[in-house]
């Protein structure tokens, strides 16, 4: 078991180095229907017909106004924007990422290659371990003029008992980007909006700012403290890394 764990960790670190090497290599090279009354030969001059027509039109209009009003009330969502900052770190101990090769070059990332991953999450102030990310990236474009790559990403952020947030969109190795918030659970139920991703150290250190809409209640205070300004040098508090009492949220996702 120890040897297997060591081997898996070694493979993970090799994958991280290959991702970084692939990134560095670019620096050197790269949404009615209608019906006619003419054929039915019905005279529109008939008083009875006109009265019935007006009555029907009035009733129909009232019906649709009622339906539309009801639908609007049923599907209205909170539009207040709530901000949430989190850090993501790959600390080399989750056997992540992996690379599933679909391209023809075994020694470098190719279009279509799949990169499943899971990393650790910390609060924006770096004092508490809150959970993990888990998802999948697909390499869709080499961008030589930017000296990097473009991935299409679909993944989730897990916050223990608080629930999770799912996102989807572009992941760029060379600049900041925005992804769509596609939903959530727990305190994040009904969430939508966008999240800004800041690449601090590719691919091991990232900073996210969520602009959350659709969440009825205020976010938990322990998730929304003042964040540490992002930089390449930031790191979690030692107590949070060690998941000591008081340095994690309740039942954090591991």
Curated annotation (Swiss-Prot):
EC number of this enzyme: 5.3.99.6
Membrane-spanning segments: none
GO MF annotation, one: allene-oxide cyclase activity
UniProt cross-references to Pfam families, sorted A to Z: Allene_ox_cyc
Function summary: Involved in the production of 12-oxo-phytodienoic acid (OPDA), a precursor of jasmonic acid.
Enzyme type, top EC level: isomerase
Subcellular location: Plastid, Chloroplast
Catalytic activity: (9Z,13S,15Z)-12,13-epoxyoctadeca-9,11,15-trienoate = (9S,13S,15Z)-12-oxophyto-10,15-dienoate
Family membership noted in the UniProt record: Belongs to the allene oxide cyclase family.
Record GO biological process: jasmonic acid biosynthetic process
Domain of life: Eukaryota
Gene name as annotated: AOC4
Transit peptide, residue positions per record: 1-52
Family annotation (InterPro entries): Allene_ox_cyc, Allene_oxi_cyc_Dirigent, Allene_oxi_cyc_sf
One Gene Ontology term, aspect cellular component: extracellular region
Major place of residence: plastid
Expression induction: Low local and systemic induction by wounding.
Name of the protein in question: Allene oxide cyclase 4, chloroplastic
Note: The four allene oxide cyclase proteins (AOC1, AOC2, AOC3 and AOC4) are encoded by duplicated genes. They are very similar, and most experiments involving antibodies do not discriminate between the different members.
Keywords attached to this entry: Chloroplast, Isomerase, Plastid, Transit peptide
Tissues expressing this chain: Highly expressed in fully developed leaves.
């Amino acid at each position: 078991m120890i040897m297997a764990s060591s081997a898996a960790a070694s493979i993970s670190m090799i994958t991280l180095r290959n991702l970084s090497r692939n990134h560095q290599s670019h620096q050197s090279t790269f949404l009615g229907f209608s019906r006619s009354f003419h054929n039915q030969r019905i005279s529109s001059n008939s008083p009875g017909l006109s009265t019935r027509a007006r009555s029907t039109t009035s009733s129909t209009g009232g019906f649709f106004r009622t339906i539309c009003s009801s639908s609007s009330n049923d599907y209205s969502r909170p539009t207040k924007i709530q901000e949430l900052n989190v850090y993501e770190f790959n600390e080399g101990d989750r056997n992540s990422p992996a690379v599933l090769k679909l391209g023809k070059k075994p020694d470098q990332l190719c279009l279509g290659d799949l990169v499943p991953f899971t990393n650790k999450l910390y609060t924006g102030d770096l004092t508490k371990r809150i959970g993990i990310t888990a998802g999948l990236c697909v390499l869709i474009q080499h961008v030589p003029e930017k000296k990097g790559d473009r991935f299409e990403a679909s993944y989730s952020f897990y916050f223990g008992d608080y629930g999770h947030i799912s996102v989807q969109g572009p992941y760029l190795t060379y600049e900041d980007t925005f992804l769509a918030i596609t939903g959530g659970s727990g305190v994040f139920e009904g969430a939508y909006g966008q999240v800004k991703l800041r690449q601090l150290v590719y691919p091991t250190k990232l900073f996210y700012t969520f602009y959350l809409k659709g969440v009825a209640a205020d976010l938990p205070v322990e998730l929304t403290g003042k964040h540490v300004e992002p930089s390449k040098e930031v790191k979690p508090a030692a107590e949070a890394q060690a998941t000591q009492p008081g340095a994690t949220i309740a039942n954090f996702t591991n």
